Amino acid sequence: MRTVLRFKAAGLMHSLIYIGFLGLFAGTVTLEIHHLMPPSLKFLQGTTYIVYSFTLELATIAYLTGLFWALARRLIGTEYRIKTKTTVDDYLTLSLLIFIGISGITTEAGRIALENFPDYEKWSFIGYAVGQFLNLSNPELFHRVSWVLHVISFFVFLIAIPLSKLRHIFTSPINMFMSPKERPKGAMKFIGNLLEADDIDNVGTEIIDHFTWKQLMDLDACTVCGRCTSVCPANQTGKSLDPREIILKVGQVMSESGQPAVPATVSTPGPLRVNSDNVFERITSEELWACTSCKACDEICPVNIEILDKILDMRRHLALMESDFPAELGKAYVAMENSSNPWGASQNDRLKWTEDLDFDVPVIDESNHEEYDYLYWVGCAGAFDDRNVPVTKAVATLLKRAGVTFAVLGPKEVCTGDSARRTGNEFVFQQLAIQNIENMNNLKVEKIITQCPHCFNTIANEYPQLGGNYQVIHHSQLLTELVLSLIHI
């Protein structure tokens, strides 16, 4: 619910529908239980019945207000993410839900009129007012017809659930409950050690069977709200990537290629012709390479769909199985393999940033590793990029002044492999990662300070997949702790 409420208007609208529907459903179940009770155990009487009736009236107001609000957003609203995916099915679904609510009111109005408007029914203020307004000549017939229509519309609603977007009523909560808890949010899915594999038939995802069951459940859980697309920086800058379309297209391939084929949640413009369960019949490589892997889509999704995981898995297939990647990436891959950094700079220049410091920066090795509390992980940008080198110098200077004992790996430090992994080249990532892990484990490194957020995430959240378990702290965290310790003194 917290994610839903990030968009305040849409969040309030959904909350009204959700709370109203649950209230009315609970009220209906309670009424049926009451009817099944023997006379001595009936409980909807006196004050209890008045509170019950009044509560259901409030639930009805919330439910219908939310539904009419949702209908207005589609009819007269201008929000792009809503307008582009509004279909006839949406109007029919909302109309059905509104009819269920209104037929419930008319059923109640007929019953109250049939009982000749007793005073205690004034607490059912909507049904009471509607009954008086209609001035029914045959309240019994009106009540029966309204009740039958109400029941029929509810059964139509039940039938529509698996055939429409309404399925998310069930699939979304299940999907949220089944979201992986053990894997850190910043970590990519581990697919095994490729360097130790004897035979590799496939890496990444190309066909529906390559996706995990949880990734496929994501497809059915999608509410097509478009929040992911609205926060996607690639989409906002005119790139071809549309995170919502990625989910819908893979969902369509899954639905149409399954046995038997079932309707997809929502279709994209134009007829769907799928000749196989290959997702690249619907998704282009340009869409996938436009992704910056920022994870904004995952963070904003109200039902915990992991969109980035699917994009990265498809990238893995393109990069390693098809060699289908931008030329610029090919150069970076070669540089990372040959020079251990994306720019092809010499490893001998890893310590060049220390040359004009007024103190020595020690390099850790087998003979001195016990003298230092922290390994300072400089990173490729921190060592080679002209804009980042001043940051490296400043961090080292502050650590020295604070009395923190630290050392660096120097030429032994190689790229963490984050760029390779995020762009699909799992093989290069694992080569670099295992080299770093073996070096640090041999030096018995336990605590690491990083300044690059990419290095922080990779070492802290992804190196454990390959046997690298360290206490990793970002320089901003450590410096904050040091400042706070001085304040407390």
Locations of the language-model features?
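Iron-sulfur-cluster electron-transfer modules
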Residues: M1-W69, I76, H210-L219, L241-E245, ...
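Charged, low-complexity surface segments at secondary-structure and domain boundaries
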Residues: F155-V156, C232-N235, D298-E299, L318
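Short hydrophobic/aromatic-enriched beta-strand-loop microsegments
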Residues: G468-H475
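Ferredoxin-type iron-sulfur electron-transfer modules and their immediate structural context
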Residues: L158-C291, S339
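A general structural motif
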Residues: Q477-S485
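Conserved small/polar residues in nucleotide/adenosyl-binding loops
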Residues: I487-I489
